[in-house]
Amino acid sequence: MFDFNGTLPLMMFQFFLLVAVLNAVFFKPLTQAIDERDGFIRTNNTEARERLAKAKSLTEQYEQELAGTRKQSQQVLADAQAEAQKIAQTQITEAQKQVQAEVMKAQAELESQKQSAFSELEKQVDTLSQQILNKLLGSTLA
């Protein structure tokens, strides 16, 4: 079946030479390209994970800052509303005091005019009473 003659070692030599040539020409560059591609993918994957972690960290940080800013703006708004309410209450109180003072002044002026009018009327009543009395007594005396 098999002859073990000089062709067998020659065939083995050709086979090993073919394997060496294929290894040098085809398999090493292919393996090198696959290794480079694998390294590139691993590097990109690692960088992507790092970027994702950094993005998540920044997102959390910005959300915390946003929540803090919202609380701060709500506090500023509440303070402004309280201050506006306080100012409005102060102005209302001051206006009420001014109105009360005006009312008191008007009442005092009316009271003064009333007293003046009563005193004038009393003078006129006295004068008229005197005139009536003079006419009545003067006509009965005459």
Curated annotation (Swiss-Prot):
Question: Any idea which UniProt keywords this protein has?
Answer: ATP synthesis, CF(0), Hydrogen ion transport, Ion transport, Membrane, Thylakoid, Transmembrane, Transmembrane helix, Transport
Function (record text): F(1)F(0) ATP synthase produces ATP from ADP in the presence of a proton or sodium gradient. F-type ATPases consist of two structural domains, F(1) containing the extramembraneous catalytic core and F(0) containing the membrane proton channel, linked together by a central stalk and a peripheral stalk. During catalysis, ATP synthesis in the catalytic domain of F(1) is coupled via a rotary mechanism of the central stalk subunits to proton translocation. Component of the F(0) channel, it forms part of the peripheral stalk, linking F(1) to F(0). The b'-subunit is a diverged and duplicated form of b found in plants and photosynthetic bacteria.
Transmembrane regions: 7-27
Give me the Gene Ontology terms describing cellular component.
Answer: plasma membrane-derived thylakoid membrane; proton-transporting ATP synthase complex
Record's keyword annotation contains Ion transport? yes
Is S-adenosyl-L-methionine there in the keyword field?
no
Q: Which family does it belong to?
A: Belongs to the ATPase B chain family.
Query: Which cysteine pairs are joined by S-S bonds?
Result: none
Citing just one GO molecular function, the answer is: proton-transporting ATPase activity, rotational mechanism
Which cellular compartments is it found in?
Cellular thylakoid membrane
Quaternary arrangement and interactors, per the entry? F-type ATPases have 2 components, F(1) - the catalytic core - and F(0) - the membrane proton channel. F(1) has five subunits: alpha(3), beta(3), gamma(1), delta(1), epsilon(1). F(0) has four main subunits: a(1), b(1), b'(1) and c(10-14). The alpha and beta chains form an alternating ring which encloses part of the gamma chain. F(1) is attached to F(0) by a central stalk formed by the gamma and epsilon chains, while a peripheral stalk is formed by the delta, b and b' chains.
Organism equals Acaryochloris marina (strain MBIC 11017)
Question: This protein is called what?
Answer: ATP synthase subunit b'
Against InterPro entries, the record matches this protein to:
ATP_synth_b, ATP_synth_b/b'su_bac/chlpt, ATP_synthase_B_chain
**Superkingdom, according to UniProt?**
Bacteria
